[in-house]
Amino acid sequence: MDMDAKQAVIAKLDELKINYTLIEHDPVYTIEEMEKIDIENVDYIVKNLFLRDAKGRQHYLVVADKDQKIDLKTLQDKIGSTKLSFASEDRLQKYLKLTKGAVSPFGVLNDETAEVEVVFDKNLVGRSCVAVHPNDNSATVVLSYEDLEKIVKANGNTFKAIEL
C-alpha cells in the first residue's frame, strides 16, 4: 500500500492511539515562514537538524525549540561525537526519506534500520504541545512531547534528551 508521507504518519499516530491535531497550510521551508502562518500553536514549533559525524558513520536528528541556539561544537561534546556537520540532502533522503524543508522527528518512521539517533532539546520534555511537520511541509501536527517520544521508541531508534 503506497501512502503519501503525511498519511503514513497519521496512520502511525492512529495505530499508536496518539492524540494530535492536524493543521493543513501552504508549504513552508523555514521557521520564519512557519511563524507567518496563522496557527494557534506557533509557540510550540520545533526546528530539526539532520547531522552527521566526521566520518559519516553516525547520523543524528536534533529536535529543539524553534528559538534554541545550537552550537555544533558544544553538541558534539555533549553527545560524545566526533566533529558534527550538516548531512547532505542525499543522506537525508537515504536515512529518513525526507527532503530539505520537510525534516521532522517523524522521519524516523522511514528509518527502517533505526540507525539515526534522535537528540531532543531537554526544554521540550514535558510539553503538552509540540508542533512538527508530518514528513510533509504543507501540514503541521501538534502533539505532546511524550507522544513524540513514543513514536521514536516504537520505531526502535535510540534517543536522548539533553540540555542544548
UniProtKB/Swiss-Prot annotation:
Subcellular location: Cytoplasm
Domain of life: Bacteria
Single annotated GO MF: aminoacyl-tRNA deacylase activity
Record function comment: Functions in trans to edit the amino acid moiety from incorrectly charged Ala-tRNA(Pro). Has weak activity on correctly charged tRNA(Ala), tRNA(Gly) as well as tRNA(Cys), tRNA(Met), tRNA(Pro), tRNA(Ser) and tRNA(Leu).
The name this protein goes by in its record: Prolyl-tRNA editing protein ProX
InterPro entries xrefs: ProX/PRXD1 (IPR040285), YbaK/aa-tRNA-synt-asso_dom_sf (IPR036754), YbaK/aa-tRNA-synth-assoc-dom (IPR007214)
Homology family: Belongs to the PRORSD1 family.
